Amino acid sequence: MKAAGAPLAADFFSGAGGLSLGLEQAGFKVILSADHEPFAIRTHAHHFGGMSVDWDLSDANVVERVAELVVAAGIDLVAGGPPCQPFSKAGRSMLRYRVQAGLRDPHDERRDLWRSFLEIIERSRPRAVLMENVPDMALDREMFILRSMVEELEQIGYSVEERVVDAWRYGVPQFRQRLILVALRDNVQFRFPAETEEKVSVWTAIGDLPEVEGGWRPEGGEYGWAEYAGPVTKFQREMRAKVPAPDQHKVFDHITRPVREDDRQAFESMTHATKYTDLSKEHQRYRGDIFDDKYNRLNENDLSRTITAHIAKDGYWYIHPRQSRTLTVREAARLQTFPDNFRFDGPPSAAFRQIGNAVPPRLGFVMGKAILESLDDPRDAGISTKKTAELLAEWWLKKDREEALPWLRSCSRWLVIAGEELLDRASRTLLRQGWKLLQRNDKPWALKSAQRTRFADELAFLTENSGREQRTDRILELADRLKKNPAALDGSVGEIRAALGVAESVADLAVLAAPREPREDREAGPEEPVLITKGVLRVASRFQGNLDVERRNRMTDGRLAVARMIGIGELSRSAHLGLIELANLWCRPVTPVCSECPLTPHCNEGHRQRNMNPTLYD
């Protein structure tokens, strides 16, 4: 790409241009951006060439126009961070149907902004896509938006990689987690950039900036400055690198809000470890049980807390580590890795809001550079999420095979719950006998007195001397609860838990294995929660060759890894159940039986086992 000149990029929902700046530092030329906030648009237009437009991307006609521009301009990378609004489960059901059927969006007058972002990509087919967003976009129970995006991008020929990253591992001096999704056309593999364990501390980032009083303003208004002595650390030198020579001893935007006298006294009594409730009573103007973190002095030797748009309101979360005031605009910009020559349009509150809403330029830089490196040295991405799900579902749907968790096929929420409570990790003999007993008594809450007594006796005999005697009592307790409320089994995960007192993982599994059609009093379709229990992380870790899936961030990396194997197409539920069964039948903690696994030809661990024992796979 580089040989023909700078590759072109578009940045949608661009804000002030943090992502745009990082992409340009990486080698892209940003020629098109769109946002809907006037101050941010003017900031972007000041710093970048091309078009910085105020267009409403929820309008289908605008989306079509933007896609045409992307094609006409020959844009290589479409980037952005679309806001994601919550939407109803009925909306999810309709969208799930359209995704599974491979249908395009109807020409709705308005739409969710993430759908607009995806529609631009589907219409323009750029070589690369980069999306940055909050982790919550991906980590709801069903991971619905992320799974939908991956499915649709794969349908049009992209390979997709996604990860929740810690921005500090790429040189950003704050604790800031972000979802990064990269899609490359023609099944080219994206390789995430290497991380660092070295943290850039708050003082390393801002320690060179001069002391100022809260509320101080320089002469000259927006053209005024504070006297600046010079950078000390490598990070500070990088922030000053493009400051024009006449301004080498000036720092702009080094202003903050005035400080109330009682706040100043409170700030002076604080260290970075002080909680709001630790302050003396005369300094607590808010209820401590509600505002327990109302004030936060930054630790100069550690990362800053996440810089958010909230800093535009009062700044109490961002008290300077040494001075009794909140951060200045320039200090907040530094912690977001905006260089000192980057100015913001509007009053301080608008500048703070632009900074808090921005993608850290340094994060944009490392991701942009990694995209260019992946495109310049193209490698095949291997098996897609859709194909992986197809293999798992095909194996799951086979009738003539051994079963580790037979209740998953029962289509009965009661049998799933009872199987988990009574027979989880049971011996083969106990599993066979216990499963037959549960099948014979598939509605124990409806048994008459004599029948219930016989069922209880059979359970007691089954579990005698097995260490599972208490599980007999648990099954009978669950049956008694259902006698009072048998309809609970048709409810949501929350309703099942409330009625039966089972673990969330058990209720999730019951809902996944035995979906229900929506009831008249509820708009929801069948739920598909993404489960990381029952050994599925082990399978995902081995399959993808990523040990972090099991060892670090199970609720983020782990859930993303599982979602990457099951997709959200018409086979996703079967694929998910197949993944759970596979973990318990063949992909064991010790001595996995890779020769029986349907994923072996595409599995990192499978390749290792094949090389060690080639005769088993002939």
Where are these regions (language model features)?
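Conserved small-residue
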Residues: 15, 44, 78-81, 117, ...
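N-terminal polyanion-binding entry modules of DNA glycosylases/AP lyases
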Residues: 380-492, 598, 602, 616
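Short pre-active-site segment immediately N-terminal to the catalytic Zn-binding motif
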Residues: 489-503
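Core alpha/beta nucleotide-donor-binding catalytic domains of modification enzymes
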Residues: 2-125, 135-139, 143-146
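C-terminal target-recognition/interaction regions appended to catalytic cores
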Residues: 234-382
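Class I S-adenosyl-L-methionine
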Residues: 68-72, 89-281
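Short beta-strands and strand-loop turn motifs
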Residues: 130-134, 345, 509-510
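C-terminal accessory module of base-excision DNA glycosylases/AP lyases that mediates lesion recognition
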Residues: 381-416, 471-477, 499-509, 517-618
